[in-house]
Regions:
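Short C-terminal tail/terminal secondary-structure segment
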Residues: 145, 233-253
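Short, small/polar-rich loop/turn modules that mediate ligand/substrate recognition or access, typified
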Residues: 86, 172, 177, 232-234
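Substrate-binding pocket helix/loop in short-chain dehydrogenase/reductase
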Residues: 96-97, 101-106, 191, 202
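Alpha-helical segment proximal to the catalytic Tyr-Lys
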Residues: 125, 169-173, 230
């Protein structure tokens, strides 16, 4: 029996790379995304490539409890079990705290943090009963350090950075492992919409002189979801090309 993974934000960027990788490794994949048109298109393509019996798409608002519960019901109905949940859906907003309105703050927190609360409530009870399962959250190096002009994103990802520890402690006794991937600047369609000069600046700031590819993050997600990472739980794993390792102090001569 194939393993089954649910991937939120699963039809573009890092999520799409993860969906393709898990399918290529023999897993069943349930993709969830707010973008219904894109999701249906991706589903058609992946169904042709991997088989309609192994891949599903469900339109989902991960900040809404009913929508997440409907996703879980559909996943269990089609595949019978869920072995891993990849909480990848997320948004960001720019601005210092005083520049943000309340609705923007609430929207980012609901999508980036509350969504993990909702998917956990929907999927963990079955994992507890089966005494097995993995959860992988997409955090960010922005949760490990501060950024200019990104207060709510820093706050949201900082919450995810510590939430993983609490979840790992609570669910370890049931054989459930919980970890985060913490990407640095990643060449997703959204990031590539920046001017080329900005993208070049980011690449030059990396000790490796490169940016992260979505496939880099997807491979780490697969590792954390699989038995290959059996002793690892409660960890934040940077996939950043080294962006988070520099203190920012001037070079000493």
């Amino acid at each position: 029996m194939n393993n089954t993974v649910v991937i939120t934000g699963g039809v573009s960027g890092i999520g799409l790379s993860a969906s393709q990788l898990f399918l290529s490794r023999g897993w069943n994949v349930v993709m969830a995304d707010f973008n219904d048109a894109l999701g249906q298109d991706v589903h058609r393509k992946l169904s042709t490539q991997y088989g309609a019996d192994r891949v599903a798409f469900h339109q989902c608002d991960v900040s809404d409890a009913d929508s997440v519960n409907n996703l879980a019901e559909a996943a269990y109905q089609q595949f019978g079990h869920v072995d891993s949940v990849i909480n990848n859906a997320g948004i960001f907003a720019k601005g210092a705290v005083h520049e943000l309105d309340e609705s923007t703050w609430d929207r980012v927190m609901a999508t980036d943090v509350k969504s993990i609360f909702l998917t956990t409530k929907a999927f963990v009870p079955d994992m507890i009963e089966r005494k097995s399962g993995t959860i992988v959250n997409t955090a960010s190096i922005s949760g490990l350090q501060g950024d200019y002009n990104m207060a709510v994103y820093n706050a949201a990802k900082g919450a995810v950075v510590n939430l993983v520890r609490a979840m790992a402690l609570d669910y370890g006794k049931y054989g459930i492992r919980v970890n985060n991937v913490n990407p640095g600047p990643t060449l997703t369609p959204m990031f590539k919409s920046n001017p080329e000069s900005v993208i070049d600046e980011f690449a030059q700031a990396s000790p490796l002189g490169r940016l992260v590819e979505p496939d880099d993050v997807a491979r780490t997600m697969f590792f954390l979801a699989s038995d290959e990472s059996a002793p690892i739980t409660g960890e934040n794993i940077p996939v950043s090309a080294g962006f988070e390792i520099y203190s920012g102090q001037p070079v000493q001569q």
